[in-house]
């Protein structure tokens, strides 16, 4: 049986992070393969694993590496399948590995998750696979609910046990609150409800990056919709739009400021969420607040301002079961299409 996911470690010392990934994949009952191959010390082995794995039917690759973590990028060089990068903290708090993984050139994206977040790498892989496998999607939803319940239970297990003189534990007790999902519909002037990809731009100054996503999706003939909605200024509108577009397969958040777009999206859907961190007018970028998400809510982060790679990553995900799109994607990645 061909596994659905291949995990490649850059070194045996990365096994602790891989164990986080394997624990999730075992829980979700997703077949996987684990290999150790270095982008620098065994480049031919990396190539053979990726090429033969792709030809055999691997759907998603996960590259786990620290230091100058070029492994995920090396994997992306030899496959049209989605590649997830998990940077490992070895030195300088893992920032060297993070930048090596996320700042990939067009058209070779790596869907990077937070430093040491092997668990989120596996959850992201499951979200991708859940687009094509209803049983996996159901398990992703169950896992998502488990993370939600853990937060709710912490109120009883931690907060309710605090016995300070002036704390009012029974005020708005969490277990008694009724938490309902949004059912409101978005009332925009025009939306494409048949969109496979939804792009949400957090503010108008980030539209230049959003347009890069849109142009590349057009070249790949992927139907999409794009709106400018700030989840901080327009929270109700944001939730209504996500609810209205719930049948889309991929959500892309264009982030600046505190990167609330992609973070807000990933909590509202079980679909893959791609984050594009942007620079603001002061030259600050919001990479860290996009990528370093807590357990259970991965954001597939691409490089700063790299909207085109977000679109290519969408194409890689959607082409898993779409040979027509795969042909377009391969032409683009082989630079036969002039973007």
From Swiss-Prot:
Its EC number is 5.4.99.18. Keywords: Isomerase, Purine biosynthesis. It is an enzyme of class 5 (isomerase). It comes from the Archaea. GO terms for biological process: 'de novo' IMP biosynthetic process. Pfam families: AIRC (PF00731). Substrate binds at residues 11, 14, 41. Disulfide bonds: none annotated. InterPro entries: PurE_ClassI, PurE_dom, PurE_prokaryotes. The keyword Isomerase applies. GO terms for molecular function: 5-(carboxyamino)imidazole ribonucleotide mutase activity. Pathway: Purine metabolism; IMP biosynthesis via de novo pathway; 5-amino-1-(5-phospho-D-ribosyl)imidazole-4-carboxylate from 5-amino-1-(5-phospho-D-ribosyl)imidazole (N5-CAIR route): step 2/2. It catalyses: 5-carboxyamino-1-(5-phospho-D-ribosyl)imidazole + H(+) = 5-amino-1-(5-phospho-D-ribosyl)imidazole-4-carboxylate. Catalyzes the conversion of N5-carboxyaminoimidazole ribonucleotide (N5-CAIR) to 4-carboxy-5-aminoimidazole ribonucleotide (CAIR). This is Probable N5-carboxyaminoimidazole ribonucleotide mutase. It comes from Methanobrevibacter smithii. The gene is purE.
